[in-house]
Design a protein with these regions (language model features):
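Feature captures the catalytic ectodomains and active-site-proximal regions of enzymes
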Residues: 1-200
């Protein structure tokens, strides 16, 4: 690329040269295991993010489209909760992916990141808990990765997770925070173990 005429013209114009090519788009379908055959339960995905929907499709999960799902703080939270609740009529497991806190982290919008988490609490978690009240169920809540405001990019630190079982009572943790999660001493070495913990 260094000697390409386009780069020579860019450098002559005082612009930075292109130093790499990133091919994005078409490809072949990855060989993911069928979710139902792997775990013995039927699953669905609710997300605005094409990557997440694609993973769901590749795992032969039901992918649910929600009108107004944007992946940002203006997403249709209520619609996602309603879709998840409805999906539980025919599925055993629903993965609801919410991108808003991550996007706010990338934009260094601390107030909106807090607001996004509060909206998830109010408009996703609470309606799901209300709809499932009196039933036996588990709910796993976690970010897929940290996106600290300070760096505005993904980082490698372990993420906190909350695994709720409607049949058990736990004492000693009164809120879901990184510090409280760390203080439990529970650490999952490999991410795929989380779903196994949830299903046991």
């Amino acid at each position: 690329l260094r000697d390409h005429p386009v780069n020579k013209a860019r450098i002559a114009a005082g612009r930075r040269p292109a130093t790499s090519a990133w091919f994005w788009g078409q490809g072949s379908r990855p060989g993911l295991a069928n979710f139902e055959q792997t775990y013995g339960i039927k699953g669905a995905v609710v997300s605005a993010v094409d990557l997440i929907k694609g993973i769901g499709k590749c795992a032969d999960m039901q992918v649910i489209e929600v009108e107004g799902a944007t992946g940002y703080i203006d997403t249709n939270f209520e619609g996602k909760a309603e879709a998840a609740i409805k999906a539980l009529d025919s599925c055993d497991y629903v993965y609801v992916h919410l991108e808003a806190p991550d996007e706010c982290g990338h934009r260094r919008e601390a107030q909106n990141k807090v607001k996004a988490i509060e909206l998830i609490d109010q408009k996703i978690v609470k309606p799901l808990l209300d709809a499932l009240a009196g039933q036996q169920f588990k709910m796993l809540i976690l970010p897929d990765h940290p996106t600290p405001i300070a760096t505005a990019t993904h980082s490698r630190e372990p993420v906190p997770f909350l695994l709720y079982d409607s049949t058990e009572t736990q004492e000693g943790v009164d809120s879901f925070t990184e510090v409280n999660a760390q203080n439990t001493g529970v650490f999952v070495e490999r991410g795929p173990m989380l779903i196994k913990m949830m299903l046991n």
